């Protein structure tokens, strides 16, 4: 279901200027300057209402977090939540994932989070899946050497498809969990969807995938 458009968005976003990053394409290659430090940059693509990004920024003050959400109705809720107690290491931004190359320079990002991305039907709309090879190629460009991707979902088929796609791309798969909430993984921060799905009895699947150097990738093809 598509979220209904919120009223007075321009005014509300302006009131959240302390936690927003407007005109993201102008910041390409300059994101660390925005934060005023050289700390690692972690990027969440599809942050929803911001629970995960805020929780991670609170837990890791030495990491800069950029939370992306194209649905402005959800993004304003995230920004207003954070605006109540702004975090210097977190910025929210609105753009489509297809524009990542225009927003981030090569090697500018240290880690990417994909949390409960839309599991578009694999036969008809697989190209819209954020773990599709074309997106992996983009991540491969904007991530630093040996940067990594963290992926969570409640959809087993989507998880298995993504695992295969990432393996075929040549990245190193690490820390797979087929039942995250009943594992020994520490430091998990839940999203709104994660809490809902877990309460309904769904398993949560998680993996980490590390970018390989080109010479290392040849050895596994």
What are these regions (language model features)?
Residues 46-48:
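Class I SAM-dependent methyltransferase "Motif I" SAM/SAH-binding loop
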Residues 71:
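Conserved SAM/SAH-binding beta-strand->alpha-helix loop
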Residues 131-145:
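A short glycine-rich, Lys/Arg-flanked "PGG" loop and its adjoining helix->strand segment in the class I
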Residues 146-153:
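Conserved beta-strand signature within the Rossmann-like core of class I S-adenosyl-L-methionine
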Residues 158, 162, 169-218:
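Class I S-adenosyl-L-methionine
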């Amino acid at each position: 279901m598509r979220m209904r458009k919120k009223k007075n968005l321009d005014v509300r976003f302006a009131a959240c200027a302390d936690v927003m990053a407007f005109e993201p394409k102008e910041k390409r290659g300059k994101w660390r300057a925005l934060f005023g430090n050289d700390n690692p940059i972690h990027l969440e693509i599809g942050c929803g209402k911001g629970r995960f990004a805020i929780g991670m920024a609170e837990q890791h003050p030495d990491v800069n977090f950029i939370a992306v959400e194209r649905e402005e109705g959800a993004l304003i809720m995230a920004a207003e939540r954070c605006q109540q107690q702004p975090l210097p290491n977190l910025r929210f931004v609105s753009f489509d994932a297809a524009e990542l190359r225009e927003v981030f320079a090569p090697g500018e990002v240290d880690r990417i989070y994909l949390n409960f991305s839309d599991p578009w039907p694999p036969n008809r709309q697989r190209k819209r899946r954020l773990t599709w090879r074309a997106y992996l190629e983009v991540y491969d460009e904007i991530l630093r050497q040996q940067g990594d991707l963290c992926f969570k979902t409640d959809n087993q088929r989507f998880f298995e498809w993504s695992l295969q796609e990432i393996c075929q791309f040549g990245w190193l798969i690490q820390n797979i969990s087929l039942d995250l909430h009943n594992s020994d993984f520490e430091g998990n921060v839940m999203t709104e969807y994660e809490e809902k799905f877990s309460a309904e009895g769904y398993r949560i699947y998680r993996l980490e995938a590390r970018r390989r150097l080109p010479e290392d990738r040849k050895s596994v093809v």
